[in-house]
């Protein structure tokens, strides 16, 4: 199967960032699938493993992501109807075959078992990814965003996320930073900040101007800086994020032309958060 990457990317991309996240997730998944096809043809792509076991590694990543997601959802004792409905809706939207749906559902169900071997599964993920930081980080962020599927992270879910981060080689501080940034992004989306403006940007309308102190605080979290950060620190964080998300640079790395507008939306989100802070601090 050469579509596991797209399926996984679209599913968790939607959880992480709505339509933008789904499209970007599909793109990431496409890169995984492309590397898999090249390796099976006898080439050495150097991404997401290599050699004859490429297909097995791809499938391991897919199943592990769903099973760990099920484990996170079960951590608070009961998987909510909203979480189940969201998973079902996304599978329908992706037009999965019956076999593919069963594979994802079985993996999710396995993760809910009380004897689910989380540490062993995470070790297999590390092997499947070749220990590459970017792929392990992607896996962790999938779990963080899935924990926010029902709008909040339960303390028990947070504990499981810490186990996941530790098993993948991330520190508690690195996890907490991702949790704060994801929570801030979620609040922006719900409260009419940049996340909620994705639909507006498609219709050509202007960004809404959040006015509350809470939304300003979220803007700091989006940039990954504290409210006490100096102007220089804010600028440095902003430039770093813009460098990582600049549409032209993403295109140069293989982003399809059709996704240029999507990349622009992401950079606009970063710019919007920066503008709020710049005006507040009087940064020139």
UniProtKB/Swiss-Prot annotation:
Pfam families, A to Z: DnaJ, TerB
Primary location class: membrane
Topological domains annotated Periplasmic: 1-6
Residue ranges that the UniProt entry lists as topological domain Cytoplasmic: 31-284
Transmembrane segments: 7-30
Residues of the signal peptide: none
Key word Nucleus present: no
Localization annotation: Cell inner membrane
SUPFAM superfamilies in the cross-refs: Chaperone J-domain (SSF46565), TerB-like (SSF158682)
UniProt keyword list: Cell inner membrane, Cell membrane, Chaperone, Membrane, Transmembrane, Transmembrane helix
J domain boundaries: 218-284
One Gene Ontology MF term: protein-folding chaperone binding
Keyword Transmembrane helix (UniProt): yes
GO cellular component: plasma membrane
Topological type in the membrane: Single-pass type III membrane protein
Low complexity biased stretches: 197-211
Region Disordered, residue ranges: 190-211
Function: Regulatory DnaK co-chaperone. Direct interaction between DnaK and DjlA is needed for the induction of the wcaABCDE operon, involved in the synthesis of a colanic acid polysaccharide capsule, possibly through activation of the RcsB/RcsC phosphotransfer signaling pathway. The colanic acid capsule may help the bacterium survive conditions outside the host.
Domain writeup: The transmembrane domain is a dimerization domain.
HAMAP family according to UniProt: DjlA
Name used for this protein in its record: Co-chaperone protein DjlA
Originating species: Vibrio cholerae serotype O1 (strain ATCC 39315 / El Tor Inaba N16961)
Recorded name of the encoding gene: djlA
């Amino acid at each position: 199967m050469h579509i596991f990457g797209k399926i996984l990317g679209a599913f968790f991309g939607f959880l992480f960032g709505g339509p933008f996240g789904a499209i970007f997730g599909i793109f990431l998944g496409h890169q995984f699938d492309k590397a898999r096809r090249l390796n099976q043809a006898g080439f050495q792509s150097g991404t997401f493993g290599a050699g004859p076991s490429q297909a097995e590694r791809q499938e391991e990543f897919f199943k592990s992501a769903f099973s760990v997601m099920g484990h996170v959802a079960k951590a608070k004792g009961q998987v909510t109807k909203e979480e189940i409905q969201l998973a079902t809706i996304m599978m329908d939207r992706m037009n999965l075959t019956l076999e593919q749906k069963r594979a994802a559902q079985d993996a999710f169900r396995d993760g809910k078992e009380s004897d689910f071997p989380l540490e062993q599964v995470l070790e297999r993920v590390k092997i499947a990814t070749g220990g590459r930081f970017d792929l392990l980080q992607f896996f962790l962020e999938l779990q963080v965003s899935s924990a926010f599927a029902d709008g909040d992270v339960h303390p028990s879910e947070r504990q499981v996320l810490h186990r996941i981060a530790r098993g993948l080689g991330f520190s508690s501080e690195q996890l907490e930073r991702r949790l704060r940034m994801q929570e801030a992004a979620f609040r922006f989306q719900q409260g009419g900040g940049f996340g909620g403006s994705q639909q507006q940007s498609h219709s050509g309308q202007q960004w809404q101007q959040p006015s509350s102190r809470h939304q300003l605080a979220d803007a700091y979290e989006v940039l990954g800086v504290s409210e006490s950060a100096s102007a220089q620190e804010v600028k440095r964080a902003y430039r770093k994020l813009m460098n990582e998300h600049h549409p032209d640079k993403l295109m140069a790395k293989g982003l399809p032309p059709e996704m240029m507008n999507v990349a622009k939306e992401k950079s606009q989100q970063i710019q919007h958060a920066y503008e709020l802070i710049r005006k507040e601090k009087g940064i020139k």
